């Protein structure tokens, strides 16, 4: 059986000066997506893709490593300034923000876009440990 020759699609380098970093920090994981102003994804990373498993994904250190990874990928596409949108109640919010600043981005705005229910769904019951 002959093998089909498929071309491997290379990532083209985009030249984007400003971007938006979406930091989604839940109780179990932290995901970072860096997009352009229109919302098209440039780079992304999460604590799970960095190799952390289980409860280690929810640590601030895992969020820091994921933010550094997404930031370095975005810098290859020419992103220099960022607006940061933070969402969720997790522990990786602050450390992901600090890591993005440490990579060398000029952060112009920080917005908290966590959805707040106006007496919507019933929350989960309290844990008894």
UniProtKB/Swiss-Prot annotation:
Annotated organism of origin: Paracoccus denitrificans (strain Pd 1222)
Protein name per the record: Small ribosomal subunit protein uS11
Family listed: Belongs to the universal ribosomal protein uS11 family.
Lineage of producing organism: Bacteria, Pseudomonadati, Pseudomonadota, Alphaproteobacteria, Rhodobacterales
InterPro entries, alphabetized: Ribosomal_uS11, Ribosomal_uS11_bac-type, Ribosomal_uS11_CS, Ribosomal_uS11_sf
Complex and partners: Part of the 30S ribosomal subunit. Interacts with proteins S7 and S18. Binds to IF-3.
Pfam family, one: Ribosomal_S11
Keyword Ribosomal protein part of the UniProt annotation: yes
GO BP, sorted A to Z: translation
HAMAP family for this protein: Ribosomal_uS11
SUPFAM superfamilies, per database record: Translational machinery components
Cellular component terms per the entry's GO annotation: ribonucleoprotein complex; ribosome
Protein function: Located on the platform of the 30S subunit, it bridges several disparate RNA helices of the 16S rRNA. Forms part of the Shine-Dalgarno cleft in the 70S ribosome.
Gene Ontology molecular function: rRNA binding; structural constituent of ribosome
Keywords: Ribonucleoprotein, Ribosomal protein, RNA-binding, rRNA-binding
């Amino acid at each position: 059986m002959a093998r089909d020759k498929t071309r491997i699609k290379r990532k083209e380098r985009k030249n984007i000066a400003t971007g938006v970093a979406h930091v989604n920090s839940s109780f179990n994981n932290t995901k970072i997506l860096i997009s352009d102003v229109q919302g098209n994804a440039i780079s992304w990373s999460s604590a799970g893709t960095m190799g952390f498993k289980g409860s280690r994904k929810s640590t601030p250190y895992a969020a820091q490593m994921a933010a550094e990874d997404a930031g370095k990928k975005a810098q290859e596409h020419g992103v220099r300034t960022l607006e940061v949108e933070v969402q969720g109640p997790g522990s990786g919010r602050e450390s992901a923000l600090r890591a993005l600043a440490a990579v060398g981005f000029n952060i112009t705005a920080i917005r908290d876009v966590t959805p707040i229910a106006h007496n919507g769904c019933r929350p989960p019951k309290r844990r008894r440990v």
